[in-house]
Amino acid sequence: MAKKRANGEGNIRKRADGRWEGRYTAGYHPETGKRIIKNVLGKTQAECKAKLSAAMEATRGIDVSRADEYTVATWLRSWYEIYAKPNIRISTANRYQLMVEQYTIPRIGSIKLTKLTAHDLQKLYKDLMENGRIDRKSGHGNPGLSSTTVRSLHLMLHSALERAVKERLILRNPTEDCIAPKVQKIEMQILPPEHIKDYLEAADRRGLLPMFYLELVTGLRKGEITALLWSDLDTLNKTISVSKQYVKNPNGELTLSRPKTETSVRKISIPQDAIDLLITEHSKHPENPYMFPSPATGEMYYPDSVVNLHKKILKDAGLPHIRFHDLRHTFATLALQNGVDVKTVSSMLGHYDAGFTLRTYTHATRQKQDEAAQTMGSFMARVM
């Protein structure tokens, strides 16, 4: 007969097959009120007792009736739809969906949520770093995801599992015990001032001077410059309005959304030369609403197509490779080095904080600090 454990901690009995079984109340069904009974097995009474104690500790404070419903896959999908998607930007939601459906669920989705461990997650990170890429050319390049992408996935999982803790589905967030990969910082590059003329001449030969001239005097993100409409240009006040961007969802489709942050919705002053170029560009397609429609389709450029055009311009000009995003860095660096204050540059870039701009472009402000030091040194020499 069953042996009652002390303090109501469960029952242990020896089964007919010789093994020991421990049974305990894990919770109560929310509708029927009936006890939810679970069990553990052991070869010896001591082993069974230890397993029973561990199992009861693991369920203490957990809503077992709900926790048992979830695997990693079902919880991540539920969290994404209910908590994440309604409260984040479209581009972030698209990235989360990709990380949930393509990177995480195929590898650990079948694990019960209550059984997920830090070890499972650490193995996931390792596998993604080594074999995580979905679309890659056979035999070429690194098949793994970047440390930046895997760290982003770690942060997403931390958020999802933290919600599971608050919902009393798991006792502790297993990401707390993980070692997230260190981000390998990409060295910032710019288009040197002595290369700008060659670059723009190459762009002009391809009929792309207005777009890439505007990029160099504004530092727009690729999704922002492709989403510009002719109506975004104010020729009287010499500004362009940035209020939208095109981003790619996990299915490869383009989606129009608000820019990266609220501070990314902005008006940017542009020089008269840029306005003149834009007016000339618009005269080629006066009925088209887009600032830079694709000659092939008449629709807006696919953002990655603009990146490819940038690569062709560099090749035409015989210039070393830099990323399209480095044109944004070029604008910021040259503006700061030529005396534009950091707050103005920050607002033009759409950064949430001038401090972020300052930290990002320390190399540019260092030159101005050196000049300031020399100025003050000369002043002090005169007065002493």
Predicted regions and their residues:
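C-terminal secondary-structure termini that scaffold catalytic or DNA-interacting sites
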Residues: 1-2, 201, 237, 250-276, ...
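Catalytic-site neighborhood detector that most strongly recognizes the C-terminal catalytic loop/helix
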Residues: 182, 190, 245-248, 275, ...
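Short, conserved phosphate-binding/catalytic loop or strand-edge motifs used
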Residues: 114-129, 176-181
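Short N-terminal "domain-start" leader segments
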Residues: 1-17
